[in-house]
Amino acid sequence: FYYRRVSRVNLYSIENFEDYFYGFMVPSTGYLQYYDVFPYEDGFMLQFPDKDTRKVAEFEPAKKLFYTLKTSRDWGRMLEIDTIGALNDVIAAGKTQQMLLTQEALFEDRIGKLAQQIVSEGDRKFVMIAGPSSSGKTTFSHRLSIQLAARGLNPYPIQLDDYYIDRALCPRDEDGKLDFECLESLDVELFNHDMNELLSGKTVNLPIFNFKTGKREYRDNYLTLGKEDVLVIEGIHGLNDKLSY
């Protein structure tokens, strides 16, 4: 609480356990009727219900996601920065730059191991990257491409954004605004056509989306996949099963 700007805090208790929580909590656990909690890995899994049916969906383990979360937790403990308070201590001590450089070194090492795994699998032609808007997908794809190139492959970063349909045809959300994040905003048919053509050894003129005009353009961006070539494809729907067929 050293860095808090207010002198009062709310403490919550249940039986003999008391703790601080960063948000508001219900007056009693009796309000919480629809949920599931069970041991998972070295912790617990807490599941919330569907907002309409109030039913808790069947649990489907996301092993890669849990591995990533565990790695992040382990890094925080190793650097002794596993809480916001500890992070504030580092900043107050003027060690921000050292922390950033250390984190970058750890991340680059992880990217290198990922690249080595891709190379060792041998027959990979597609590397798919997904994440929400402004999460660093493009930056990550380029960093991964550098590591792949250092291991003898010829990576070609591709942005799914270049497969947007013309802006005039883009779906709108419930507020009437253009919805660039829905799968329907992408020309899935064209994407599948181009990828299949590349896999069959044909030369493809890849599109480039002009965000100023809101239209797709072709600028002699030709590509033919060779033996050591690999496509590094990134976008919001990079891991969406409905993207490919």
What are these regions (language model features)?
Residues 136:
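Conserved glycine(s) of the Walker
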Residues 233-245:
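ATP-dependent NMP and nucleoside kinases share a basic, alpha-helical "lid"
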Residues 156-158, 165-214, 230:
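Conserved nucleotide-sensing/catalytic segment adjacent to the nucleotide-binding pocket
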Residues 139-144, 159:
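Hydrophobic positions on the alpha1 helix immediately C-terminal to the Walker A/P-loop
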Residues 1-109, 114, 119-122:
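Auxiliary tRNA-acceptor-end handling modules of aminoacyl-tRNA synthetases
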Residues 122-123, 225-227:
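Short loop/turn elements that form and flank the Walker-type P-loop nucleotide-binding site
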Residues 146-156:
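Post-Walker A helix-loop "phosphate-sensing" segment adjacent to the P-loop in P-loop NTPases
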Residues 127-131:
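Hydrophobic anchor at the beta1->P-loop junction of P-loop NTPases
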